[in-house]
Amino acid sequence: PEILLCDEATSALDLETTEGILALLQRINRELGITIVFITHQLDVAKQIFDRVAVMENGVVVEQGNTFDVFSAPKHPTTKALVERYLGIAVPPQLVPSLPAGTIVELRYKGDAALEPLISQVAQDYGVSIDVLHANVEYFGSQAIGILIVLVSGAGEPLLQALNTLRTHVFSYRELDRGQLVVAAEAADNQEA
C-alpha cells in the first residue's frame, strides 16, 4: 500500500506498547516509504513521530503544516487552545497572592533559543531577580518549544532594560497581571481533573 491509515491506534494502550507501535510505524515509514495518516488526540504521539500535522474542528481542517511550525506558532484558535492545554501554565492559584512585587512575564522560546541561559544572563547583567514560577520544554523531534513564567523584580532603568532584553530574545513575550495568572492556573487545574 502507499498509505497506511491509523485511527486512534495508540489511544487505549499502555506506554510500553504505545512506544513499540510508534517505533514499528516509524520503521515502516522509513524502510518502505509508506505514508502514514495517523488520527489521534494525543499530542505526545504527534510530537514524537509526525512530520506534518492537520488540526481539525467539526470535521474541517483548520490548520496544517510542519508539526513543529504548527505547534510553535499556532494561528487558529483551536490550535492555540490545544497547544495552551498541552504546554499550559501550572502555577498553583493559591500561590499567586503570596508572590512578591514584580513583573510577571510569560516567555515562549522555540528552537535552539529554548536551550540558551537567557534568564541567568539577564539577572546577572542587570542586577534583577528572576524567579521561575513555571517552566516547560517539549521536544518535537529534535526541536524544542519552551514556555517560562517568571517574576522579574528590580527597580528603575535596570528593570526596564532587563524586561526589554527578555522581550527581544524570545519568540513570544507577554506580561501577565496576577488575575490572568490565577485564571490560567485554575484552567490548568480544571483540565487535569
PLM regions with names:
Residues 4-7:
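Catalytic Walker B motif of ABC-type/P-loop ATPase nucleotide-binding domains
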Residues 15-17:
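Helix N-cap at the start of a conserved alpha-helix in ABC-type nucleotide-binding domains
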Residues 19-32:
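Helical segment within the ABC ATPase nucleotide-binding domain
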Residues 40-41:
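H-loop/switch region of ABC-family ATPase nucleotide-binding domains
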Residues 46-48:
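A short, surface-exposed alpha-helical micro-motif characterized by mixed small hydrophobic
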Residues 64-65, 73:
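ABC ATPase "signature
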Residues 72-102, 106, 126:
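C-terminal boundary and immediately downstream tail of ABC-type ATPase nucleotide-binding domains
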